Amino acid sequence: TSLWAKNSEMEANSKLWIKTNSVEDELLSDSSYDEMLLSNVKSAWMVEMWCDEENIRSIEKDLDVNPGDINYRVDIMAWLIHSSREIILADDVFSDEHMPQIAELIKQLDVLRLRVRHGCKEDLLTLVNIPNVGRYRARELSKLDIRTPHDVANMTKKKIDQILKIRGWGPQLLDKIMLEVAKVIEPSKQKQQKVRLDDIPLDDEI
């Protein structure tokens, strides 16, 4: 179900009209800029903004929608992407020589579905899967060069102190996140090199 374009968005030079014009070459429909076309573009634009980590308040304001609209369309889009993936896998019209391209397409669809589900860019996908880490917290971690669960498991005290200074973070929350990561990843242990006696130079060798 598409988001209906408002009367103001039907007018030439509205934000939605300009957006539709900018993606005209990507549209599968040849219809003129009627209400249905603008509504379809509006729905796709909303999901695009969501995946590009736009603030929810900004999406609501720019597109005149509410949180329910966003959640509903995001769920539908994720389902459509998954369905597309299954159709491609089940289709037997492709020959063996197309398998590398099919595999790449499936990979891209999987990434896109995860981006739609979590509302983030691709570089955050390894972080947003951690319980209690949504897209906002994941982006805050990435700004501190913490980009993977391994990075979380091996955070230094300095990194932890930096995180706790960020608004919305607290010791209890960070402990929960680190405990979740510790269930699947053990912090790498720094191996200290032992100095062997025969490695110590003699006086006449210095």
Protein language model annotation of sequence segments:
Residues 88-100, 112, 116-126, 131, ...:
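Accessory alpha-helical DNA-binding modules that contact the DNA backbone or grooves
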